């Protein structure tokens, strides 16, 4: 007789995991491991970190995957190390060296002036090896296929580009910096452009994301820590409360939402969370033509 199958592991509760991604893993690698740790296929990630980068990566579990496309993650902060003296095919340390330049006479003041030019509202050409789509195909896929890629500049905002330290080495200069920027900004492109401005070439040596939207490293856990204690960083109610404006409903209005009925507009900008009198989230909603329209229903099926 065949042995009976082990009981199926119950699905985890819905919510967010704030992961401190290690270097060398893709964002999809992190999702795959989180699926195993949490015992569910229903895991997704918001935003992407390059394999060389570390730091904050937001994962949705179970019904919380519905939140991922609506999270306001348009402001991000990084700790970066820029290497001046060589440019690479990928604008980071993983690419092949394209050019080298003399850094012996570059001064700290010149570096500060170059950084200032890259602060504020700027036009940035994304890195050629990036996920930007050109005629429906990712730029990195075109590069790997041997195509010459020309990506148009696009507007981004660099809110902060603060130099923390400068080290003059024998054949290059390393710059440690804090970069706070809008979504779509490539920090490795900042390194490339700083090196180009100084006439020596530049690339990104190291990158650590410390914040994305309202989520910070202070709440992040490593994958090894999650293995030991596979618990959510934020349950579904706490996740919505942390990431969206909140609208609390009385019992009658909450009942109307549960039955798919329209309720009056909230007078709030953008997407907000609808919470019942018990503090549980019912849906994400947005005002539209005088009513509150559900954008994502978060009630269990």
Regions found by a protein language model. Name each.
Residues 1-45, 49, 53, 115, ...:
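Accessory RNA 3′-end/elbow-binding domains used by RNA modification enzymes
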Residues 64, 69-126:
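Acidic, low-complexity central loop/insert segments
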Residues 88, 120, 152, 166-170, ...:
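Short, conserved beta-turn/loop elements at beta-strand boundaries and strand-helix junctions
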Residues 36, 58, 148-191, 196-198:
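The conserved catalytic core of RNA pseudouridine synthases
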Residues 59, 80, 136, 190, ...:
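Residue-level signal for inorganic ion chemistry
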Residues 130, 134-158:
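Extended alpha-helical targeting/anchoring segments
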Residues 121-126, 188, 200-206:
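Short, structured loop/turn "capping" segments at alpha-beta junctions
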Residues 42-72, 141:
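Glycine/acidic-rich beta-strand-loop module
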